[in-house]
Regions:
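Glycine-rich beta-alpha junction loops
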Residues: 18-21, 41-47, 54-57, 84, ...
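Glycine-/charge-enriched secondary-structure boundary and capping motifs
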Residues: 5-12, 63-65, 69-81, 85-156
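Generic alpha-helical propensity signal that fires on short helical segments
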Residues: 11-12, 28-32, 49, 55-58, ...
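Acidic, glycine-rich loop-and-beta core segments that form the ion-binding/anion-interacting portion
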Residues: 31-78
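Glycine-rich anion-binding loops of enzyme active sites
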Residues: 1-51
Length: 156
């Protein structure tokens, strides 16, 4: 990651692998117009967009120990370093209690606009998303304003 690791530094990462019965594999091919799309709330940046964040912070010379402008009482650094929410408990509970779930999309780098289409069985299927139907974590609003980021880019 340019600008982050110096010679002799390293990154430690991990992953997990799951096992599922073939008949329970997702996405299913029966996704169709009119299906309901449900989103689980993010608690912040998770692990995405930090190259952009670093650029904004460096350009604007931001003191990360200052409080956020959202009156939450949290500092900028507390927002930026908030641990990634892991959704496995919620997802497993949903899958256990409903046989109507046709797909799950992991919204990572690329955001909603690049990840959601991966679950659709063909290009005739799409999604209408009302962006005002949920409260976006304040760190996104703050970064968008500070970095003059357009609406499409902030969705990534």
């Amino acid at each position: 990651m340019p600008g982050l690791y110096e010679k002799g530094h390293f990154d430690l990462a991990g992953f997990s692998v799951g096992v599922v019965e073939r008949n329970k594999l997702l996405p299913k091919q029966n996704i169709e117009k009119g299906d309901l799309l449900i989103g689980l709330p993010s608690n912040g940046l998770h692990s995405n967009g930090y190259s952009l964040v670093r650029n904004i912070m460096n350009q604007k010379n931001i003191n990360v120990s200052l409080p956020m402008s959202d009156k939450s009482g949290e500092t900028i650094v507390e927002n930026l370093l908030r641990p990634t929410k892991i959704y496995v408990k919620e997802i497993l509970e949903l899958l256990k209690n409903s046989d109507g779930i046709k797909a799950i999309s992991n919204i990572t780098g690329g955001g909603i606009t690049e990840n959601l289409p991966r679950i659709f069985p063909n290009s005739n299927i799409g999604a209408k998303i009302n962006l005002s139907s949920w409260k976006r974590p304040s760190i996104f609003n703050w970064l968008q304003e500070l970095g003059n980021i357009d609406d499409q880019e902030i969705l990534k």
